[in-house]
Design a protein with these regions (language model features):
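Catalytic alpha/beta core of large soluble enzyme barrels
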Residues: 1, 11-18, 28, 32-47, ...
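Terminal amphipathic helices with adjacent charged low-complexity linkers/tails
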Residues: 61-65
Length: 207
């Protein structure tokens, strides 16, 4: 939990369907190094001193996984014990990497290293399931809002991208629609129950 006058320091691991424990460790290492380097950037010119003090004391990281449901190991499809073991290994590896690099950089070791966040925007940019959630369906329409005065939005309208005025702000905003096909054999919301999703959340919370 963040203190008052404290900010996140997030870095993201994109999980792919073919990732195994070794490739995940490599990604975790790089994301942790990046986060630890970001934790050195505490010269906040326009904020009160308490922001700098909190950032330096806790040196927080937020190494997150997105695309969990695209991977058999991390989605629990290979069994609960394998998932729990993998999460413990990855967490320990992130903590050890942070410890090593914090010492090299002359900063405090992070008081928190790992997290899981929804990652809605990142998942769209890299085409993966969002955070620890399944994809919606095999085929669906993704909508994206844009300002009617934005040059990119204007170009898209001129080039024939499907669009319509926004219901909420029809004079200033448009909504573009994109057809999306999810990867074959991915987990979609109709293939996992609410209880199974909560069990997965619990595993990530505990490990």
């Amino acid at each position: 939990v963040l203190r008052p006058s404290q900010m996140c320091n997030l870095s993201e691991v994109v999980v792919r369907s073919d990732d195994d424990i070794n490739s995940l460790k490599r990604k975790i290492r790089l994301a942790t190094i990046l986060g630890t380097m970001q934790a050195t950037l505490t010269n906040f010119h326009y904020l009160r001193d308490i922001w700098k003090q909190n950032a330096e004391e806790e040196a927080l990281l937020g190494v997150s996984l997105t695309g969990v449901m695209d991977n058999k190991l991390l989605s629990g499809q290979e069994g609960k014990s394998k998932l729990n073991d993998a999460l413990e290994q990855l967490k320990a590896y992130a903590i050890e990497t942070n410890k090593t690099w914090a010492k090299k950089l002359g900063i405090n070791q992070a008081t928190a290293v790992t997290t899981i966040k929804p990652s809605g925007t990142v998942s769209q940019l890299v085409d993966c399931a969002s955070g620890m959630h399944p994809r919606w369906s095999q085929y669906y329409i993704r909508t994206v809002r844009g300002s009617i005065n934005d040059p990119v939005a204007k170009m898209m309208m001129e080039r024939g991208f499907p669009w319509e005025p926004s219901v909420m702000k029809p004079d200033v905003e448009v909504v573009f629609s994109f057809p999306v096909k999810a990867p074959d054999n991915c987990i979609t919301v109709d293939r996992i129950s609410a209880i199974e999703q909560l069990e997965l959340w619990k595993a990530y919370k505990e490990h």
